[in-house]
């Protein structure tokens, strides 16, 4: 998701002097690798949706890096004899089949698709090709064949970033025992195939952890969902308990960002992804400057989520006179900041991790008509030419140059006639 300008989301920040560089701690090579799916998923296997991670060979990685989109020929042929003449017998398809270099991976992909009921969603170590879903017939990450997967992977800028720039802005891990200049570690690339599930995007949330403290969280989808406000305290309690029990003391790094999905009846939390604590990770409804300057929550929550009424206790540390405020969890509060302030206007410290939702009147809400990742899209003519292989792209470029030359000539003739 494209990063938003912090000034557009935090007017209070725009009036203050902002540092030219966000005050992130150094992002190390190991932190990026710890956030790779192949590293963290085995540890949290029971917390994640069903998936398979297929180790990739250098030849397959080279295929993903190569220019153009050349797909293996489909192996399913028509049943009728009348259609057999549509297939060439001269071996041209076999010669242009890129999968001959990685037949084992091709076979694993096909068997995994079959194992997962015929539909999967793909990603590499860190990213899913969400910016390329416009290439899909279903306009989502649903893939039914290996070629569906290859098309998404090779059309995605996010995948290109995983392949070419995974350690941008990173520093080597400190090692006082070695004075040799550190080199970037090798990356064991994996193709992750997750069983396709039609997730409800309104129930996906991004959570930010600093120094092993759950700092804040927000919805991932940037549309307004009115029902979320009455569920906010319940969902926050679920996420906090999940973090405390499963992630707080088990993830290798103290700072990270994780995504969860909490489907109805909102009893179970699924771990979807773990992301680096770095500006490459989209802060969504926050700004990174806001998160980095945020104070740790100090509240203690006591909640019976299964009871008829939910409540929690806020401990307000205000000089020598601590106060206790009980808040009804059923209140439909659109602005959590206003709710906190009403409990104790003089308290500067947050009681609980802030849970930010898109408000009804938020200018970013109701973005159903705005195509997501539209900056990554290409004209259909370019896509069609790339699907035809190197020859198709060369032909397209030749036609494009002819069009430009003709346009230049017309402009010149028009100027001469004046």
Swiss-Prot record:
Q: Which GO terms describe its biological process?
A: eukaryotic translation initiation factor 2 complex assembly
Q: Which residues bind ATP?
A: 123, 126, 128, 130, 194-195, 204, 206, 220, 259, 273, 275
What are the Basic and acidic residues biased-composition ranges?
Answer: 1-10
Q: Where in the cell is it found?
A: Cytoplasm
Question: What keywords are assigned to this protein?
Answer: ATP-binding, Chaperone, Cytoplasm, Magnesium, Metal-binding, Nucleotide-binding
One MF term in the entry's GO annotations: ATP binding
Task: Offer a single GO CC term for the protein.
Answer: cytoplasm
Per the record, which residues fall in region Disordered? 1-23, 71-101
**Any idea which positions bind Mg(2+)?**
273, 275
Q: Where is the composition biased (Acidic residues)?
A: 81-98
The record's similarity note reads:
Belongs to the CDC123 family.
Q: Which PANTHER family match?
A: CELL DIVISION CYCLE PROTEIN 123 HOMOLOG, D123 PROTEIN
Q: State its role.
A: ATP-dependent protein-folding chaperone for the eIF2 complex. Binds to the gamma subunit of the eIF2 complex which allows the subunit to assemble with the alpha and beta subunits.
Name of the featured protein: Translation initiation factor eIF2 assembly protein
Q: Which organism is it from?
A: Neosartorya fischeri (strain ATCC 1020 / DSM 3700 / CBS 544.65 / FGSC A1164 / JCM 1740 / NRRL 181 / WB 181) (Aspergillus fischerianus)
Taxonomy of the source species = Eukaryota, Fungi, Dikarya, Ascomycota, Pezizomycotina
């Amino acid at each position: 998701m494209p990063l938003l300008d912090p000034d557009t989301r935090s007017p209070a920040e725009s009036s203050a002097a902002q540092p030219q560089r966000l005050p992130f701690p150094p992002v190390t090579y190991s932190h990026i690798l710890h956030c790779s799916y192949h590293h963290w998923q085995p540890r949290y296997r029971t917390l994640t949706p069903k998936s398979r991670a297929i180790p990739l060979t250098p030849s397959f990685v080279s295929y993903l890096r190569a220019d153009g989109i050349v797909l293996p020929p489909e192996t399913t042929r028509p049943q009728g004899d009348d259609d057999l003449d549509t297939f060439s017998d001269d071996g041209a398809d076999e010669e242009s089949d890129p999968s001959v270099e990685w037949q084992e991976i091709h076979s694993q992909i096909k068997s995994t698709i079959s194992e997962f009921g015929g539909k999967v969603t793909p990603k590499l170590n860190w990213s899913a090709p969400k910016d390329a879903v416009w290439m899909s017939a279903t306009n989502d990450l649903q893939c039914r064949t290996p070629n569906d997967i290859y098309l998404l992977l090779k059309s995605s800028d996010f995948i290109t970033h995983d392949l070419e720039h995974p350690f941008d802005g990173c520093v080597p891990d400190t090692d006082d025992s070695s004075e040799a200049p550190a080199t970037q570690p090798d990356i064991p690339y994996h193709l992750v195939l997750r069983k396709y599930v039609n997730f409800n995007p309104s129930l996906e949330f991004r959570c930010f952890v600093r120094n092993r403290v759950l700092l804040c969280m927000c919805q991932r989808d940037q549309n307004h969902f009115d029902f979320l406000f009455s569920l906010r305290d319940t969902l926050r309690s679920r996420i906090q308990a999940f973090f405390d029990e499963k992630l707080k003391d088990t993830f290798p790094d103290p700072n990270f960002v994780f995504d969860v999905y909490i489907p109805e009846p909102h009893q179970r939390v699924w771990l979807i992804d773990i992301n680096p604590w770095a500006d490459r990770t989209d802060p969504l409804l926050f700004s990174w400057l806001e998160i980095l300057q945020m104070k740790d929550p100090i509240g203690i929550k006591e909640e019976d989520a299964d009871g008829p009424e939910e409540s929690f206790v806020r401990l307000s540390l205000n000089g020598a006179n601590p106060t206790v405020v009980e808040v009804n969890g059923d209140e439909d509060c659109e602005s959590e900041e206003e709710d906190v302030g009403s409990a104790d206007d003089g308290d500067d410290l947050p009681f609980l991790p802030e849970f930010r939702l898109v408000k009804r009147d938020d200018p970013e809400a109701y973005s159903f008509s705005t195509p997501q990742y539209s900056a990554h899209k290409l004209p259909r003519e370019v896509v069609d030419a790339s699907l035809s292989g190197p020859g198709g792209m060369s032909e397209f470029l030749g036609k494009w140059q002819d069009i430009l030359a003709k346009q230049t000539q017309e402009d010149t003739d028009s100027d001469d006639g004046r």
